[in-house]
């Protein structure tokens, strides 16, 4: 009874905060300056990571770029230098914890303390559970979520000491709603979203108000990781569009960045609608892609 009474007493606050949130959405947010910041981006040799590096290069930042692909990271670095940025590329396998820690030491010695960390590196395997090999499952979690722990543990202390910084988690819409034949990927992205949310609350509990967090959750992106993805939610997203939303979210300290915005509505529907209706809804959304190993379409 006391719990119910407490909830009723909180209703006026809920109404006030809802109105406040609505008004804030109508007012354009001022973008913060990131000039002079040291920005580290993992998975910067291609796709979202590469384009994010280009955008930060235009903003007078110092870039630290990581990728497992030497040619890819050098190409990104060359373009960023043409855009006027100081760039430090490193070949790093984000599935290897000790390799990450070794690179961290080099970054601190050669460049300095990272103040904006973009955990972007990711892998995906399209297969049913039984066709997904054990090493593939392990690598999915090592890159898609465990690497976030190792990099954040390494660079967050300096941000907390200065009460200034930003940790960016590149997750996925698959971190909120599941897709068949992406079991390992969805599980790892749910973990990445959980990492972001728990880190956000932990920083708040510690009083680190100057250390910001953001989490990107896009729908399918045309980067070649998944072959011919399609959904009735709309066309496959182009990387440039996603990065535009990501940069706006970072520069305005947005905590959760959904692309498209309708993904946010889906996450709410999954929690309140009956399961049978959700089954019908998922059939209407009709997520499809090629090259599913182990599954035979009947």
From Swiss-Prot:
Gene3D superfamilies: NAD(P)-binding Rossmann-like Domain. The keyword Lipid metabolism applies. It is an enzyme of class 1 (oxidoreductase). One of its GO terms (cellular component) is endoplasmic reticulum. Its main location: endoplasmic reticulum. NADP(+) binds at residues 40-64. It comes from the Eukaryota. It catalyses: 17beta-estradiol + NAD(+) = estrone + NADH + H(+); 17beta-estradiol + NADP(+) = estrone + NADPH + H(+). It is found in: Endoplasmic reticulum; Lipid droplet. Residues 1-21 form the signal peptide. The keyword Oxidoreductase applies. Its EC number is 1.1.1.62. GO terms for biological process: androgen catabolic process; steroid biosynthetic process. Can convert androstan-3-alpha,17-beta-diol (3-alpha-diol) to androsterone in vitro, suggesting that it may participate in androgen metabolism during steroidogenesis. May act by metabolizing compounds that stimulate steroid synthesis and/or by generating metabolites that inhibit it. Has no activity toward DHEA (dehydroepiandrosterone), or A-dione (4-androste-3,17-dione), and only a slight activity toward testosterone to A-dione. This is Estradiol 17-beta-dehydrogenase 11. The lineage of its organism: Eukaryota, Metazoa, Chordata, Craniata, Vertebrata.
């Amino acid at each position: 009874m006391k719990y119910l009474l407490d909830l009723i007493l909180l209703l006026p606050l809920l109404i006030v905060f809802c109105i406040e949130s609505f008004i804030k959405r109508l007012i354009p947010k001022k973008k913060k300056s990131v000039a002079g910041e040291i920005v580290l981006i993992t998975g910067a040799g291609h796709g979202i990571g590469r384009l994010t590096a280009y955008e930060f290069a235009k903003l007078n930042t110092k870039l630290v770029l990581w990728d497992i692909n030497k040619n890819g990271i050098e190409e990104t670095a060359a373009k960023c230098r043409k855009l006027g940025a100081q760039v430090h590329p490193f070949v790093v396998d984000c599935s290897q914890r000790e390799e990450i820690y070794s690179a961290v030491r080099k970054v601190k010695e050669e460049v300095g303390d990272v103040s904006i960390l973009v955990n972007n590196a990711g892998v995906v395997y399209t297969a049913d559970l039984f066709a997904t090999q054990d090493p593939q499952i392990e690598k999915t979690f090592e890159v898609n979520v465990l690497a976030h722990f190792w990099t954040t543990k390494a660079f967050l202390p300096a941000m907390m000491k200065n009460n200034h910084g930003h940790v960016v988690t590149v997750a996925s819409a698959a971190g909120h709603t599941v897709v068949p034949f992406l079991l390992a990927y969805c599980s790892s992205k749910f973990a990445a979203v959980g990492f972001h949310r728990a880190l956000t609350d932990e920083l708040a509990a510690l009083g680190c108000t100057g250390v910001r967090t953001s989490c990107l959750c896009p729908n399918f992106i045309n980067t070649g990781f998944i072959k011919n993805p399609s959904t009735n939610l709309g066309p496959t997203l182009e990387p440039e569009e996603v990065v535009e939303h990501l940069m706006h979210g970072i520069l305005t300290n947005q905590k959760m960045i959904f692309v498209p915005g309708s993904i946010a509505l889906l996450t709410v529907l999954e929690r309140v609608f009956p399961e049978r209706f959700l089954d019908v809804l998922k059939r209407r959304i009709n997520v499809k892609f090629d090259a599913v190993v182990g599954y035979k379409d009947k």
